[in-house]
Amino acid sequence: MGTGPAQTPRSTRAGPEPSPAPPGPGDTGDSDVTQEGSGPAGIRGGETVIRAGMGDSPGRGAPERRHKAQPGRARKYEWRPEGPTSMGSLGQREDLQDEDRNSAFTWKVQANNRAYNGQFKEKVILCWQRKKYKTNVIRTAKYNFYSFLPLNLYEQFHRVSNLFFLIIIILQSIPDISTLPWFSLSTPMVCLLFIRATRDLVDDMGRHKSDRAINNRPCQILMGKSFKQKKWQDLCVGDVVCLRKDNIVPADMLLLASTEPSSLCYVETVDIDGETNLKFRQALMVTHKELATIKKMASFQGTVTCEAPNSRMHHFVGCLEWNDKKYSLDIGNLLLRGCRIRNTDTCYGLVIYAGFDTKIMKNCGKIHLKRTKLDLLMNKLVVVIFISVVLVCLVLAFGFGFSVKEFKDHHYYLSGVHGSSVAAESFFVFWSFLILLSVTIPMSMFILSEFIYLGNSVFIDWDVQMYYKPQDVPAKARSTSLNDHLGQVEYIFSDKTGTLTQNILTFNKCCISGRVYGPDSEATTRPKENPYLWNKFADGKLLFHNAALLHLVRTNGDEAVREFWRLLAICHTVMVRESPRERPDQLLYQAASPDEGALVTAARNFGYVFLSRTQDTVTIMELGEERVYQVLAIMDFNSTRKRMSVLVRKPEGAICLYTKGADTVIFERLHRRGAMEFATEEALAAFAQETLRTLCLAYREVAEDIYEDWQQRHQEASLLLQNRAQALQQLLGATAIEDRLQDGVPETIKCLKKSNIKIWVLTGDKQETAVNIGFACELLSENMLILEEKEISRILETYWENSNNLLTRESLSQVKLALVINGDFLDKLLVSLRKEPRALAQNVNMDEAWQELGQSRRDFLYARRLSLLCRRFGLPLAAPPAQDSRARRSSEVLQERAFVDLASKCQAVICCRVTPKQKALIVALVKKYHQVVTLAIGDGANDINMIKTADVGVGLAGQEGMQAVQNSDFVLGQFCFLQRLLLVHGRWSYVRICKFLRYFFYKSMASMMVQVWFACYNGFTGQPLYEGWFLALFNLLYSTLPVLYIGLFEQDVSAEQSLEKPELYVVGQKDELFNYWVFVQAIAHGVTTSLVNFFMTLWISRDTAGPASFSDHQSFAVVVALSCLLSITMEVILIIKYWTALCVATILLSLGFYAIMTTTTQSFWLFRVSPTTFPFLYADLSVMSSPSILLVVLLSVSINTFPVLALRVIFPALKELRAKEEKVEEGPSEEIFTMEPLPHVHRESRARRSSYAFSHREGYANLITQGTILRRGPGVSSDIASESLDPSDEEAASSPKESQ
């Protein structure tokens, strides 16, 4: 590997040699597969060969290395090439040392034996047991046929309003206290429950459909002696599965064999960790050799003993017991569910974990019931209203008691009217008033809100501007109850790969000898026809065209140009796949990373074609001439070296060292710094400005005597070549690769940042790649100070010393901050990441936490400084001391809070190398300590847990895999659509629902508080003022349509203005449109309206001698009702800002319904049918026929409207006009001060920012040099040097003893 020893030729290398190979294509007879204590094992006649050409390259004849059997060690250790064995961070291989170690493993699986695996049980509760091993069926839906009704009712009655209505319905069913018909509340309640249940059922049916699509995917399972086509849901633990190229792995499986050499298997894990580069997995050598036929696979009875299912994506320890021998297993032998098989024709695996036991499903988390901030606020407001109604009812009940007592005292001769005691009658009147005033919390408001949420969701589905035509993906609201949350988002947590980027890397530009070549270069003239017709190996998909560069290549005019392309064709780990029969001249490259594939393809198009490789040779075609280079050593990429080097011998005999890597390490090792080097630096700076991913190329010729000396003595290259600064003689140039972003990503992020939304990128990819994308999408900028581990430690030290004072305002105003951290550092820093998620639910008061730690302040600060020193020197993180568990928990909370506070003060946060569980816990931490609305967006299975944890989850469709979509609340086709989803639909939904709630509370109080004032004048008897039909139809017809229009169509600004002025989005983040204060204002406004309507009518009704006189209850009720209806109609007219014909129609229809229904219910013919049901006979006509009464109604409406009109329209307009006049009088203002540009913080010795980013995976060089990865090779192989020839690689070089 890159940090370990490089390789020496086999003739000079001490130690054991690799294992033997099976016969080559031309061999006959039995293969060389052997087992300890047995002779050669061939393939018997009649057996079907499932693996052709498997094994190591021919000519490798030494037996495999084994540990000798020792007493008490009944196991076998198998040698195989050392390489990376984890997906994200390199997992450390853990071999089992003795039998006692196996006792810690609780998971035991036997191959091809379902009966054996099915006997294991686990206790659930009491005596109830179930099968220990889960099936491979995935269920993300919340309900099934039996659980839907009870579970849905249980969830619905978590709403306080539903409980309130249920209590009122129960009280209403008691005849002695009921003041309204039983069906007046029970019918709306049933409708409300039915509507919400239907909505939940539709949402859950979509989940069931997605689950069926996944569970019904086809796979091949070994049944008996053949593989049969089955479904994913039919898989069981212990089954042997056959996977083909491009198949998705259906469960966590132990790799048994593959058609690749040495049973390698290449997998793409972009759906798990977001990395685009390929990773390799390798089967055990024993299964690779022995399981070569279907018959042998069917008779395989090996037993795997391993750790129980867990969420650690990069860790696995176990052993395989087979034929009385044991073989250790690690993550490098495991294929995880969700991976996609790449560049491997066929592989075979043994299912270890299935279904919800798989690692990816362990990281997915549980389905949470998401509630919006307004929904939670409504629960609290319902409690407040209920308590207020109870208090009012108590006051009215006491008033009734005093009234009855006074009546009995003054009218003792009518004592029979009140036969019961005063207390008993007051008790019953209390409940009567409670039922009468229960409509203060109108059930119709909750019913209409369901239609409003549904309608706004439909508008999202219908928005053609969020339709992604290339992949036919429309926007979709999978959850219909979170629309207003879209207008309150403060934090966005985004995946990188597939979310911000397209996963497409293209060769964009290059710089050779200080001259830039590329599509945008002045020297570039785009040809009218294909310039690569002369090259039969050219890839027509490459879009890089440069006529001047092509002319230099074809005329051999510049040696540096030839060396440039020669380096790209030689210095890599790419393999050549077999060409299709119909196109024998077409080369198929197998690249470990898209970066290397793009570089080798570019060299191929310019005439330097990589043809093939063996263990110690590379064959390329240079402008039609085939040349073979002998590979003497390969030094692979790693995170420390940041470069790859290849030492080759040219056909002419000269030895040359080719190196490509980061500019920061290449320039430090140049022989000289001339004009060409400075020109290359300028080109790199320009490439960095364009956010291209760059690599520098350099080489040097190595003298024969130096190489021979190195070969014989195995000394470090830094000692041999003496001068580190002169290790590379000549700089060839630089390459620039474009990691294409999705369309509109930079503009979207810029707009969202203006909306006061903080964007965090959480990715499993490497840090260099993530930072490069951060600059490309303008999340990071050159004037930002990027904080990494050391800076974070220093700042947190200040936090602890200053007692919860993280950063001063002065320090924040000086520079913009960005945070870049990795998952390992988060694991050390945040205690919650090492605990169960329920630890995040523990709330510790911050003041109490500091008080707990105040007693041991000195020791605490000393321990914190010690912890920081431990971090700096790479030692385990020291935890602050605590006297007891509570103090320890307090310190943990403070440590978490410090990190969240620091991150929240940064302009951008990028978390690299994080697991799916870490993504979710980061989101949970922000929610815990900042109580803000969070949104998570991603496209892969590794984003599911994050999407579920966030308040709003958005899944991107159209990428590989739909698991993120199935667990999301909203579906988009591209990241750029998030801008319109939040700023337009989210903001509109928030504005609409807030205006709807405010208006509904206002009109409810305006209409219902009249009952209270009326009770003060009727002896507190509980007699309703209004006609019964007015109460029944008020929220159904008379006032519903305008408020429904507000909830569905209201727009305070247009969609274009919402996008042009993203600052308007802040109103939702600050809860400005509906909060406790707005609620109090609405209630107060409704109370004042009811006072005006009631007492104005009461005042005119006392004028019994005037022309507007009326003294009957019915006329009084009609006048109050009419005043109330017109007042709330004027209020809705003032609220609406988006006027359309539909808006006018809803207002006219509401008034028309009132006129028609009032005339009908108070007509003579209905009175004749049922006088008790329709008692208001011609009351409307007596009111409408009196101009004086109508004038009183108009006066009441005017008194209610004019103050509101002045506050909302006249005063703001005058204030704005006055501000404009003052601005004109003052004239153009001069700048009092100018903001100086922020100083650029240089993290390197040079001022230029390095845009190096390479997604290559460490370990492929060893596979090549050991022959593990090769199908064919020469008759005599040679291992690569065991020491690094890279003269600057002190850490990679090794001594002779180490190589042995």
From Swiss-Prot:
Any one GO cellular component localisation term in the record: endoplasmic reticulum membrane
InterPro entries, sorted: ATPase_P-typ_cyto_dom_N, ATPase_P-typ_P_site, ATPase_P-typ_TM_dom_sf, ATPase_P-typ_transduc_dom_A_sf, HAD-like_sf, HAD_sf, P-type_ATPase_IV, P-type_ATPase_N
Region forming the signal peptide: none
Alphabetized CDD domains for the sequence: P-type_ATPase_APLT_Dnf-like
Side Cytoplasmic, residues: 1-149, 198-381, 453-995, 1049-1078, 1136-1141, 1208-1300
Binding site for ATP: 495-497, 596, 637, 660, 693, 763-765, 913, 919, 942-943
Exoplasmic loop side: 172-177, 404-430, 1017-1028, 1101-1112, 1163-1182
Keywords: ATP-binding, Cytoplasmic vesicle, Endoplasmic reticulum, Lipid transport, Magnesium, Membrane, Metal-binding, Nucleotide-binding, Translocase, Transmembrane, Transmembrane helix, Transport
Listed PROSITE patterns: ATPASE_E1_E2 (PS00154)
Transmembrane segment boundaries: 150-171, 178-197, 382-403, 431-452, 996-1016, 1029-1048, 1079-1100, 1113-1135, 1142-1162, 1183-1207
GO BP term, pick one: Golgi organization
Positions bound to Mg(2+): 495, 497, 939, 943
Topology relative to the membrane: Multi-pass membrane protein
Role summary: P4-ATPase flippase which catalyzes the hydrolysis of ATP coupled to the transport of aminophospholipids from the outer to the inner leaflet of various membranes and ensures the maintenance of asymmetric distribution of phospholipids. Phospholipid translocation also seems to be implicated in vesicle formation and in uptake of lipid signaling molecules. May be responsible for the maintenance of asymmetric distribution of phosphatidylserine (PS) in spermatozoa membranes. Involved in acrosome reactions and binding of spermatozoa to zona pellucida.
NCBIfam families membership: ATPase-Plipid, ATPase_P-type
Other notes: Association with flippase complex beta subunits TMEM30A and TMEM30A has not been detected, neither did their coexpression change the localization in ER.
Record family assignment: Belongs to the cation transport ATPase (P-type) (TC 3.A.3) family. Type IV subfamily.
Name recorded for this polypeptide: Phospholipid-transporting ATPase IK
